[in-house]
Amino acid sequence: MTERAEGASKAPRSERVTLPSLVASPEDLDPGLILRVAAGDRLQLAPALLAEVQRRCEAAREVLRHGGPVYGVNTGMGALAGVRLSEAEQLAHQRNLLLARASGGPPWLDAADARALIAVRLRTFLSGDSGVSGALCQRLAELLGQGIVPAIPRAAAGCAGEITPLAHAFGPLAGIGRVLGPPGGEPEPHERAGDAQLAAAPAQPGAGTMPAAEALRSRGLAEFALGPREGHALLAGVPGATALALRRLADARALESVMEAAAALSIAAAGAARDPYAAAGARGDAVMAGVLGRLRAAIGDDPEPRALQAPVSFRVVGPVLGHVLRACDTLESAVGRALSGVTDSPAFLDGRFLGTAGFHGIDLGAHCDQLTAALAHAAEVATARVHRLLDARVTGLPAQLAPRPGPDTGLVTVHKRAAGEVHALRRLAVPASIGLIETSGGQEDVQSFAWESAEALRGALRHAHVVTACELLTAFQACSISQRPAPAGCRPMLRRLAEIIAPIEADRPFGEDIEAVLSEGLRSWPWPFRPGAG
């Protein structure tokens, strides 16, 4: 539960002080709280929970003192797993694990993604499966509270698991590597060169970095001394793919809602027959029934449709967006399994260390790929609707929605922008979780590439947002010049768009309108029929 300082509810939003959220059990650090931590919330770990984590840690260390070889603790890793380490080597081994494995580079995850990753890692540690200390869990919470955000590479993991990005994520605990710096921090080489890939990613204010050791000193924190197995535990599992999938899932659900709104405006503008949106057509499919119900609430009835059948892209809105929502649901289930399941290897279970396959994130990767494909299809269908809205035969409106067809070009290049975005999105829809590459001398001969699947989903969302903005702009213009009265359920959306888009009375650079819809219209969208809204 999130507590607020006394009187904070009466203060302006910018002045409110939020107290840390109390975590009394691993389950308290649920997806909703992880998203709030990503946005900046702090955590307070209950003393009883830390005591239980420490009890499990002591039991694990007792097994280590008297047991045989344990992978990554008293042995090497990967192809060197057969090498036993001396007691002296074991003392330095856990810190060393975070050194050479940090082979990634920029562009970095933004601060929210990085904070979500730390929160997921903390959630898995609080289960006790890792055998780490309560002090390590407390330090992770302190890093979140102090705003120390590691510089974690976005791409090129190439691991069975996530060892490379996790080495970057948790090296700063021990003063290794770099963290995202304040505005004016040291720029990265690609930043100085104007790297296009960074420009396409969400910008981090003053996106430079600073040495982790310097950041710790500036906050009065010592470098954390890793105990037995703690370096290896920090590199285990799939906390990155879990965090990225959770963040993209929230983005996808929000976007799907706006896609419904854009489709509703297009249906109204085209005067499409309403039969495909009838409740009877969704028998046996509760998800599609929800989509169709929200569409009906927006578009109402049309006693005089322009044609017996509208083009297919208008008729299939229910199945297309229902599939997007189902893909969100299945990805949400995969995230839940990753948060509650065993992802450590070896994991400390039933009083012994047990090698597991918890690092293999195919469940997350495959479902990220599925959602990317669903978004690609939805964007393709939306782009087809944009094209049809420019066609006077479909709408009865001036060709290309131009104020003066011929002297004015109209919105034809808005459709071409959408077509270009869809072309880029299709390339991202190739499943990232397929394609194995042997590493570590064949010891790691399989990867799931779940991290890459989550990154592909991020790109897909970016392109799908632009396509949706193109449809909103086109449908707005069509509704604006149509003699048909707008359905009552669509009027709040049209009023909102009218606040953003000036009347189109002649050709102009429509890219500016698309950017305005992206930056303003999609941020606070008045779609009153959101899923779950009643």
Protein language model features and the residues they cover:
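C-terminal auxiliary extensions adjacent to catalytic cores
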Residues: 15-49, 56-64, 68, 167, ...
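Acidic, glycine-rich active-site loops and adjacent beta-strand->loop/helix elements
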Residues: 77, 123-124, 144, 156-161, ...
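Short helix-coil transition sites and intra-membrane helix breaks within transmembrane domains
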Residues: 129-130, 163, 379
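Short, conserved acidic/polar surface loops in the N-terminal third of protein domains
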Residues: 9, 82-84, 129
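Glycine-rich, flexible loop motifs
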Residues: 17-67, 94-152, 249, 281-282
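General N-terminal targeting signals
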Residues: 87-88, 94, 114, 134, ...
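FAD-binding core of FAD-dependent oxidoreductases
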Residues: 71-93, 100-125, 151-175, 194, ...
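Intrinsically disordered, low-complexity proline-rich regions
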Residues: 1-18, 159, 186-205
